[in-house]
Each structure stands twice: as C-alpha cells, then as structure tokens.
Amino acid sequence: MRASGRGLLVRGLAPCGPGGGFEGHGLSLGAPSPRLDPGAARPGAAGPLARVWDVSDLPPQVSETFDPTRWRAVAGFEDLTDLTYHRGVERTSGPDGAAERDLPVVRVAFDRPEVRNAFRPHTVDELYRVLDHARMSSDVGTVLLTGNGPSPKDGGWAFCSGGDQRIRGRDGYRYTSDPDAEHADAIDPARAGRLHILEVQRLIRTMPKVVVAVVGGWAAGGGHSLHVVADLTIASRQHARFMQTDANVGSFDGGYGSALLARQVGQKRAREIFFLAREYSAEDALAWGAVNDVVDHDQLEDAALEYARIIATKSPQAIRMLKFAFNLADDGLAGQQVFAGEATRLAYMTDEAVEGRDAFLQRRDPDWSGFPYAY
C-alpha cells in the first residue's frame, strides 16, 4: 500500500521494477551473482553485497515518488544537505530470513523542493561529489538524476530550476557563510563566485555510465541544461514542464545546454526554446525528440528502474564505448581523446598488445607472426 503525503511507502518485497530483477548482472531475486561475489565488498563502501536487513533499515521517504523498500542510503554521504543519494537494492524475505542485495543503479536527487530544487555552489559541490562516486563504482551502470518533492510550500514539483538567483553575484553564484542562508547578505566575501555546474555537465558527459534524467516537475534554466546533457530523459505526464529561462535573467548556456539541444530538436526549435522562453509540456518535448518517454507521475520510479534493469542486461564495455562514440561527433578533439583512450585500453586486452609489452620487458624482439594483417 502507498501511504499519503511523505509517509512511509511499502509495497511488499516484489522484484524491483515491472520487468522483474536485474538478471543481466546476475542480480535476480534469490540467485547469486556470477559477476559480483555476494561475499565481496562493494567498491567504495564497506560491507558485503548480500546483507541481512529488517524494516528499521529502510531509509526515510525523501519524496512522494520514492519507494524506501527499493533503496538504501549510500554510506559515507550522511552529511549531504542539498541532495539525497541512494543505491538500488532488492530485498527478499522468506523461511531462510531476510536478505538485501545491491543493484547496479543509484538515485541522485536534488533535495531543495521548497525552492524548486534550485542549486547553489554548495549543491553543485555535493552533486559533483556523488556523481564522481557513482563514476568510480564499478558495480553501478545507471545513474538516475531527479528531484525530490513536492514543495512543502505549494505542492509544486521540480526536477531542477537552475541556479538560485538570490545568491548570484557579478562573478557567478556565491558561497554563503551560513549554509541555511537564503539571501545575498550572507554571501562569503572570501570566496569567488562559481559557475561550476558546467563541470558537472562535463562529468555527466564523460562518465562511462548511462545518466537518466527523471523529470518529475520543472526543468528550467540550468536544470533544463542538465536534462539535455543527460543520456536519456523520462518525464512525468502530469507535472513535467520544460522552460529555458536563461535569457530572462541575463544568463545563457552557450555550451552543451544550447548546442546539444539543437542536435536533439533542430536549430529552429532550439532557438525558439531559448529566445521565447515558453513553457513546454512533457508531450511537446517527446514529440520534438528531447524526451525518451512520458509516463504517469506515480510510475516515474518504475519506469526509471525499468530503464536501469534493461541497461544491466547489456555489455558494460559496449555501453561505455557507445556513449563515447555518440559524444565523439559533438565534442571535437576532447571527445576524440576520450574515445581514443578507451580504444587504446581495449587494444591492451588483445594477445597482440600483450606480445608487444612482454617482448619489451623480456628484452627481445616481438614475434608478430601469429597476428595477420586482417581485412
């Protein structure tokens, strides 16, 4: 049953997502993982993959669309104030006791619903930190980027509404001396302004994971650009709204936020979105090619986890190389460098490359006779 408001949501302990468990990585219910030893430690965290659990281990319900039975808080991030960070899990209970197993998906959510999940420099610091942790977690294949809600003030929903204009200075968004401050009078004069959300965009673009924007409400300004930079986007039919407000506040995303949008929806439509700053629905964005799926609001989590389940059935190496290949055409020499590095690493795995290395270390001439000039 689903409790009303932000109370605990409990649906029982069915497999995660409408398509069942994450079978591709050996994480279906009750089955040991051939890729991940249940007794092994999680990369970047302490403790085994398979754990005993009880109801007291469930995390708080951080959003109305968040099902605590499907998630656990990621250890080491208890100090987050502007975000929440959770790892997908499958939980079972039976005659042999209750067990919990990690799934290859994480949920990263803006947690400032009272200001439409606007970001400040502190928010961006946290966002980079958790995304980089996900990047370095070798058992995570999908990152769900979303926004908690609704707003306690008016019940409105937001994915992210961009930079918090209250603390924007002449040189960028400013740190405040008091993390809870809401106005410019608390700005810390010792720290320069920031626009490092662009560093987050680059991280999303280059991390070898599929980043899915799960848009449950407003995606505006810098939040609109984050959805554009993400690999995939799922939007709420009832509450998702898209609006590029940069020009309204004397700002502009002249990088990924505009260039990639033009790739997705075409030059004329992208210019309309920026120049006119109109509000667009999820159905509009779907028709234009800026969104992959539109689902009912209460199905957002199911749909996002289904994406993650399907991605987990694919080759991690193939997903990695496909992402970098898609990026290559738009990222110039920087994109070529990323792709070239990954291609070189793949070449290192061949017997031919091993022969070259071993010959050097053994101070002999390499024997290439077993490696034809294939065509």
Predicted regions mapped to residue ranges:
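Conserved CoA-thioester-binding segment of acyl-CoA-metabolizing enzymes
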Residues: 2-9, 13, 24-25, 29-32, ...
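Amphipathic alpha-helical segments at domain termini/boundaries
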Residues: 47-107, 111, 278-312, 320-331, ...
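Glycine- (often His-adjacent) and acidic-residue-rich active-site loop
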Residues: 115, 147-199, 250
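Helix-loop "lid/cap" segments that line or gate small-molecule binding pockets
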Residues: 273, 285, 325, 329, ...
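Crotonase-fold acyl-CoA enzyme core
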Residues: 138, 202-316, 350, 358
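Terminal peptide-recognition signature
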Residues: 108, 112, 126-127, 145, ...
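Charged catalytic carboxylate motif
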Residues: 122-126, 196, 203, 303, ...
